[in-house]
Amino acid sequence: MGWLSSIFWAFWYILPAYFANASPVLVGGGRPIDGGRVWRDGRRLLGDGKTWRGFIGGVLIGTLVGIVQYFITPDFYGSLETAVKLAFLLSFGALIGDLVGSFIKRRANLPRGYPAIGLDQLGFLISALAFAYPVKTLSSGQIIFLLVVSPFIHWGANYFAYRMGWKSVPW
């Protein structure tokens, strides 16, 4: 596989996680996942920005992206069942990684929406890759590539969402 092809398939593989991670800003709102509960430090577990609607909506959107991908490139997945499993695990893993990041940010007393460089851009990716590993994985070179480019994609997507009025801050 040539390097350009390898880059394309790395993006294709991770696309459900990218969509899942970006979707809650559009479909979120409603009841917070933590239900308003606080940790031993007196701060919220996750905060108002992490909602059930955003989490479930993000997982569904990411999974649907994977299903659409299957119908475009069925050979990449081998079967619809594999595509659904992989897309679900990438999406679920991405949002679990985002929740873990929010938990860590609350412990560090960072306010909602405040940037945490590295954690915001890579936590979702690392978690998505870990969750999806049992179904299908990438080469180490592809993973390194995604670790390098994902922060830039994340920053660009957040800036776009800010300019569109979907986010109140550009990070």
From Swiss-Prot:
| Cofactors that this protein relies on | Mg(2+)
| Gene transcribed to yield this protein | carS
Which domain of life does the UniProt lineage start with? Archaea
Under Enzyme Commission nomenclature, its number is 2.7.7.67
Residues that span the membrane, as ranges: 7-27, 54-74, 84-104, 115-135, 141-161
Does the record's keyword annotation contain Transmembrane?
Answer: yes
Q: What species is this protein from? A: Thermococcus kodakarensis (strain ATCC BAA-918 / JCM 12380 / KOD1)
Record's keyword terms, sorted: Cell membrane, Lipid biosynthesis, Lipid metabolism, Magnesium, Membrane, Phospholipid biosynthesis, Phospholipid metabolism, Transferase, Transmembrane, Transmembrane helix
Q: What is this protein called?
A: CDP-archaeol synthase
- What EC class does the entry list? transferase
> Could you say which residues form the signal peptide?
none
Q: Which reaction does it catalyse?
A: 2,3-bis-O-(geranylgeranyl)-sn-glycerol 1-phosphate + CTP + H(+) = CDP-2,3-bis-O-(geranylgeranyl)-sn-glycerol + diphosphate
Q: Which family does it belong to?
A: Belongs to the CDP-archaeol synthase family.
Q: Which GO terms describe its cellular component?
A: plasma membrane
